[in-house]
Design a protein with these regions (language model features):
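Extended, hydrophobic/aromatic-rich amphipathic alpha-helical segments that build helical scaffolds
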Residues: 1-3, 59, 117-122, 176-204, ...
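Long, intrinsically disordered, low-complexity segments
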Residues: 20-80, 169-172, 177, 203, ...
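An aromatic- and glycine-enriched ligand-binding surface/loop that stacks and positions planar moieties
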Residues: 1-135
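Short regulatory "switch" loops immediately downstream of catalytic or recognition motifs
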Residues: 7-22, 124-128, 144-162, 240, ...
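Flexible, polar/acidic helix-loop-strand segments at domain edges
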Residues: 103-181
Length: 302
């Protein structure tokens, strides 16, 4: 923690390319800054470049825009899920996608006033565009930003890798995926040692006042600091190993959440009993149980 050479980025939003992109209306052109390898637009063309790795990165999965459907290259194939179902206003750099992972109203209500919120989430209304709600499922009006697909700002809305002729747009997003960063380590250190030191270093980065140590404060801080980075679900699972704590927290966010399916307003439902009966675990494939000579036993509830 102290001698590994790691440190927090000065600005929280600068860690993710979609979060730190400058507004074209104010800069005249996009200068897409990033703390890792990326590309930027100089107002005329796209340029490839190898940025220096952020000192906040502990473990990083490097990705590029040369992936193809034959398995060549190492492209980002998940960002396409996170874009909205139709094209956005031209003053936002986020490309269209498959409309998955909409942000729940519960998250918005909890963290709207946190200084990290706009680096994590973008609002259709604030971006000045109306979604085609008839083509969306579980639409809430909010999408994740950190790993969103990126595109040109000229109104064509084409994804960058596709426009550059680098294979198919669904598999050529070049944003890296960070498996672990230093902020996560600091919060884990606080949790393990029962002190507020790491917690308050993370809070100080975004100008928040110090807090006393409590497991509740640690859990809330992790929920916003590491939002939409593939961490929160596993935090919920480890907080209660039988899946009951995770079920309780997921139900708060998903039971009765107002969404639109095909343009029709409805409310989501979360099957708590189904989740807890399986302790939140997936089914072990029967083929793997057979291959193990029945050493493996099926998870409860399946």
């Amino acid at each position: 923690v102290e001698n590994g050479g790691y440190e927090l980025e000065k600005n929280y939003a600068d860690f993710w390319m979609p979060s730190c992109t400058k507004d074209a209306s104010s800069t005249g052109s996009y200068a897409w800054e990033t703390t890792y390898a990326g590309k930027w637009y100089d107002g005329k063309t796209w340029k490839a470049g190898q940025g220096s790795l952020s000192k906040e990165i502990v473990l990083n999965l490097k990705l590029n825009s040369t992936h193809d459907y034959n398995g060549n290259g190492d492209g980002n194939t998940f960002s396409v899920y996170l874009g909205p179902r139709n094209r956005c206003a031209t003053d936002i750099c986020i490309a269209s996608g498959w409309g998955a992972c909409p942000v729940t109203p519960y998250f918005v209500e909890q963290f709207r006033n946190d200084p990290r919120f706009n680096a994590c989430v973008w609002s259709c209304k604030d971006a000045g565009f109306s979604a085609d709600e008839s083509d969306s499922y579980e639409y809430t009006g909010y999408y994740t930003r950190k790993y969103a697909p990126m595109c040109f700002a000229d109104g064509t809305r084409q994804e960058v890798g596709f426009q550059l002729g680098e294979q198919h747009q669904n598999i050529t997003y070049y944003q890296d995926y960070t498996i672990m960063r230093y902020a996560d380590v600091l919060l884990m250190h606080s949790e393990l040692n029962g002190t507020a030191d790491g917690l308050n270093k993370v809070r100080a980065r975004v100008g928040l006042e110090p807090e006393d140590y409590s497991i509740e404060n640690i859990r809330k801080e992790r929920a916003i600091e590491l939002a939409f980075e593939g961490v929160h679900f596993w935090d919920l699972m480890r907080y209660g190993k039988d899946g009951s704590y995770a079920a309780q927290e997921i139900a708060k966010a998903q039971n009765g959440a107002k969404v639109k399916n095909g343009g029709v307003e409805t409310a989501t439902k979360f099957a708590v009993d189904n989740f807890t009966s399986k302790k939140g675990l997936m089914q072990i494939p029967k083929t793997q149980i057979t291959l193990s000579g029945n050493v493996l036993t099926q998870n409860a509830g399946w």
